[in-house]
Amino acid sequence: LNQFIASSPLPIMLLNENEKNINIADFGSGSQEIFFQLSLMDIKKKINIDSIEVEALVNFFEKKKFNNKQVKINFLKKFNFKKKYDYVHISDSLQYVYDWENFLKKINANDHKYIIINNVPAGKNKTYITKQKFYGKEIPNIFFSSDKICKCLNNFKLTYKSLFLNKINGVYRSYPQDNFNKRDR
């Protein structure tokens, strides 16, 4: 590929959205990038974001003032699988979900409009777990078979995939994997 995406496609997708009220589940929303991007856009829609994050971040963000006129945000510690969303946005986080197959199958069971899986380490390899050095700690990290992800989300159709270059130490590049077999990269 001669192109890469540096952030989520969700804000651009909303430009062609016809609905006046849009519900978004933002799983692994981290620093609330989606909220801030949408808040800066001239969108004539009401957007409600359920931001699903770990408890420490939810507790931190609940103390802040995030809402603006068009975009409202709720902070949740667990994904609401019973709620129907227009957009389910999973970015930079699926690789840390231990029971990821069950998680995706529960999402698949609902009638969401779109599911966006952004910055997930996936390819034509088998799914495997390794360790990642993360702020001085080693944590489990899953590398996915893209075919297996598609099987878990069989009520949806894969419409686009691209190489994602992540910003690592200030430089956009692919994940360093020289220590893995070539078939697993």
Which residue ranges define each predicted feature?
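N-terminal accessory regions of S-adenosyl-L-methionine
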Residues: 1-23, 32, 135-136, 145-146, ...
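Conserved acidic residues
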Residues: 22, 86, 113
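Class I SAM-dependent methyltransferase core
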Residues: 26
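Class I SAM-dependent methyltransferase SAM/SAH-binding core
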Residues: 29-74
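Short acidic low-complexity segments
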Residues: 73-84
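A short SAM/SAH-binding and catalytic strip from SAM-dependent methyltransferases
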Residues: 87-99
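A short, conserved alpha-helix within the catalytic core of class I
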Residues: 96-110
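Conserved beta-strand signature within the Rossmann-like core of class I S-adenosyl-L-methionine
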Residues: 111-125
